[in-house]
Amino acid sequence: MTIAKSRLLEVAQVGVIAGLAGGLAEVAWISIYGAISGVSVDIVAEEITRSIAPHASSSSVWVGILIHLTLAVSLGVAVAFAIRLLLLGYGRVYAEFSLVILTLTTVWGVNFLLVLPYLNPRFVDLLPYSVTLASKLLFGLVAATIFRIKRMRLVRVARHLAV
């Protein structure tokens, strides 16, 4: 395997980890909100399923969680490659966190203000916008932290090899 392919695979792997961690953080956040507010998180998962597969079976709660995590992993990989391209050689931590948070805020805006009102209006009304935005920002914070940890490990390895 060439060095370039190895680096691309490494970026994809960290994207998978960041996306999965961010997606799980969102599930945890919505679960906590549901426990406090009395909103059924099962309905949230079912509506995720209905957004993608409107005629899904009774196992739509688990399907909704699977769909959510699959989309989260895809988003994590996409953001990992965006960071790799846009911040190549730029070591400022605020730039990395800012780019990830800006990207996730944009994703939230497109989803909740453009796509979901058309695709599944019921889903948009399940939770307050502030809760869903906080969920996406939490995803961004978790993902950015993972990207930063990975970058710091690479810097340490490079310094170690240079010595």
Task: Briefly describe each language-model feature range.
Residues P121-A134:
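Non-cytosolic membrane-interface motifs at loop->transmembrane helix junctions
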Residues Q13-G15, R84-T106:
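Internal alpha-helical transmembrane segments of multi-pass membrane proteins
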Residues S51-L71:
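Interfacial helix-start motif at the membrane-water boundary
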Residues I36-S57:
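Membrane-interface interhelical connector segments
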Residues G23-L24, L102-L113:
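Aromatic-anchored segments of alpha-helical transmembrane domains
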Residues S6-S37:
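N-terminal signal-anchor transmembrane alpha helix
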Residues F81, W108-P121:
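Transmembrane alpha-helical segments of integral membrane proteins
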Residues V73-V77, S135-I149:
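Hydrophobic cores of alpha-helical transmembrane segments in multi-pass inner/ER membrane proteins
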